[in-house]
């Protein structure tokens, strides 16, 4: 039942996404000076608590910035940073970062096998769907549906977000609650395994 709810929710969200107006990456680059302190000059952060956003799907980046600005997503470290930017400017920023190249990372070999199994096949006994169903086998996500790129993301950040969805602290995954449903029965060890696998997935 949970798997059916998951896939129906994904279909609804994908069909509901609107097409955003044309964005200007060069104009976006000019607005990113304040972003570089945490996310690096090209969207590759140097600290695992700050997400890599280089190469991230444009529509996902835009949605997250809009959610943070409207406080639909809690992000205390970004409080006020987006307040004076309009939607077109946020679209331009998203376009710029989506065009940047994501740096590669190395993985914890002790966790990779379990992480790969969960990512590609899910956990049947817990009715947890495969992450790859929405985020693609290579972790590239789904741009039109605003499902994020996961490959190459810092494990610390991925762990923090999965735990936030699991606890309900983060809840901007839409009415379908796909991420909250998926993460609710994941153990800390399983979350860490998936995060480690994703960091080295390219």
Q: Predicted regions span which residues?
A:
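Positively charged n-region of N-terminal signal peptides that target proteins for export
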Residues: 1-5
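Sequence context surrounding c-type heme c attachment/ligation sites in exported
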Residues: 26-33, 58, 62-63, 120-132, ...
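The feature marks the first
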Residues: 25, 29-71
